[in-house]
């Protein structure tokens, strides 16, 4: 039988361990480097002379909005790519190409809409996310420029998923490597060399994203790719696009609810601790994102293996892929937990040298990331549901942890505990523990049923 995946890997026959290594390592590097687009900005901004702490807090206010922009890329890309991978497993590449073409046009339409909205409602949005009279100056400087590069963000994040789902892991990694390395180079030049400050950080980011977007579109239009962008597929077909968006709802909810959570955290921290508390949360969020990226990358690398073999009805390879992926996720998360609990100041000093900000963030991070060792299980199970095309359970789990558990705790705990700031931060690990317990319980039952059904068929 001729397999219609990329020539780099054989998702149907290669050893699962070797496959996971080949796909996960580039995906992990891609996730880490991709995060550097924003994290590097914060690292440099936090060390701007005299105004670093307040400028960092201002950019931190922009993060929830940036998450919303990324969420729409997840809606289309992370919904369409697994479906394309499933059809490749069924030896139906023409349908997979049509799905990709529909997603490409959808991303363009979403990008234009988001750009107009961000520019038109910039001030009220920033005020909604708790920008103070001091921080809104820097928030507007960053967001005003970043909004203009929305289409580049959508193309890079959304369409790169279609490179990865074909097995072109190295090419997928190059997408973010090119842009992120350029961003790392341009940031100090624009921020300090041209004395542009926060504006320079935003400009460096969108230039870098633009180069990455060009790379993605060039590859998907070239000769090397299995699935190719074709003009005849640029017409929206509801029967192809809507199921992809339905599958993308889970990652969309996971990403967009992070924005809602940031709003809730900022509201409470602004009330009890002011700009210093919000600045601390900016740092904690940055460290948490950076810590979780390898897990996201590992499950992203494992997803094509699971999706392809699910489509090919190969239950044994699906099981091996999931178990190995989960073991790696849990091991990594445990190491991160130990490092954060023992050496919190090391992580905080990356973003600031302000004494007041360092003092609060150093004790807060130990609380905020107390249950991070369990998140490997959570993410592995949740991403495997997506690999199976099981949108309903994925959406429920995404909503359960953040909307049903975490957000109520953010508002309830300060009314119970005397230390209000501590109460806000401790909501995170409590929600993590409850969510992991629920996810693992549901997954075990569903996974057994899925394997049994595949064996029967």
Question: What are the language-model segments listed below?
Answer:
Residues 11-43, 47-51, 64-83, 108-115, ...:
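N-terminal transmembrane alpha-helices
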Residues 1-24, 84-149, 193-249, 306-371, ...:
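Short alpha-helical transmembrane segments in multi-pass integral membrane proteins
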Residues 146-164, 172-180, 201-214, 296-300, ...:
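Short runs within selected transmembrane alpha-helices of multi-pass transporters and secretion channels
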């Amino acid at each position: 039988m001729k397999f219609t995946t990329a020539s780099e890997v054989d998702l149907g026959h290669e050893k699962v361990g070797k496959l996971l290594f080949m796909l996960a390592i580039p995906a992990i590097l891609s996730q880490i480097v991709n995060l550097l687009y924003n994290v590097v900005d914060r690292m440099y901004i936090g060390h701007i002379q005299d105004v670093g702490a307040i400028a960092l807090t201002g950019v931190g206010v922009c993060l929830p909005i940036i998450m919303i922009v990324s969420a729409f890329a997840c809606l289309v890309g992370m919904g369409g790519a697994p479906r394309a991978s499933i059809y490749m497993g069924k030896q139906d590449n023409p349908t997979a190409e049509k799905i990709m073409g529909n997603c490409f046009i959808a991303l363009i339409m979403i990008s234009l809409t988001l750009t107009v909205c961000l520019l038109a409602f910039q001030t009220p949005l920033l005020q909604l996310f708790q920008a103070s009279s001091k921080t809104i100056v820097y928030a507007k400087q960053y967001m005003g420029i970043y909004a203009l590069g929305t289409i580049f963000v959508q193309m890079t994040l959304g369409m790169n998923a279609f490179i990865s789902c074909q097995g072109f892991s190295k090419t997928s990694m190059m997408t973010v490597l090119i842009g992120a390395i350029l961003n790392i180079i341009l940031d100090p030049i624009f921020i300090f060399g041209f004395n542009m400050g926060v504006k320079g950080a935003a400009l460096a980011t969108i230039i870098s994203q633009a180069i990455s977007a060009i790379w993605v579109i060039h590859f998907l239009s070239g000769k090397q790719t299995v699935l190719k962008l074709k003009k005849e597929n640029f017409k929206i077909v509801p029967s192809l696009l809507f199921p992809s968006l339905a599958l993308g709802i889970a990652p969309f909810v996971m990403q967009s609810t992070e924005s809602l959570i940031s709003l809730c955290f900022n509201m409470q921290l602004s009330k009890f601790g002011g700009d210093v508390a919000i600045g601390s949360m900016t740092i904690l969020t940055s460290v948490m994102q950076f810590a979780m990226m390898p897990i996201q990358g590992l499950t992203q690398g494992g997803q094509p293996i699971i999706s392809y073999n699910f489509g090919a009805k190969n239950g044994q390879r699906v099981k091996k892929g999931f178990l190995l992926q989960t073991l790696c996720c849990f091991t990594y998360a445990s190491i991160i937990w130990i490092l954060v609990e023992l050496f919190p100041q090391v992580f905080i000093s990356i973003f600031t040298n302000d004494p007041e900000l360092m003092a609060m963030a150093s004790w807060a991070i130990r609380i905020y990331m107390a249950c991070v060792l369990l998140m490997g299980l959570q993410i592995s199970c949740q991403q495997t549901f997506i690999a199976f095309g099981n949108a309903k359970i994925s959406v429920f789990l995404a909503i359960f942890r953040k909307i049903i558990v975490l957000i109520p705790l953010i508002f309830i705990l300060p009314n119970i505990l005397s230390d209000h700031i501590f109460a806000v931060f401790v909501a995170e690990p409590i929600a993590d523990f409850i969510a992991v317990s629920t996810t693992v319980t549901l997954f075990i039952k569903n996974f057994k049923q899925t394997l049994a059904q595949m064996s029967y068929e």
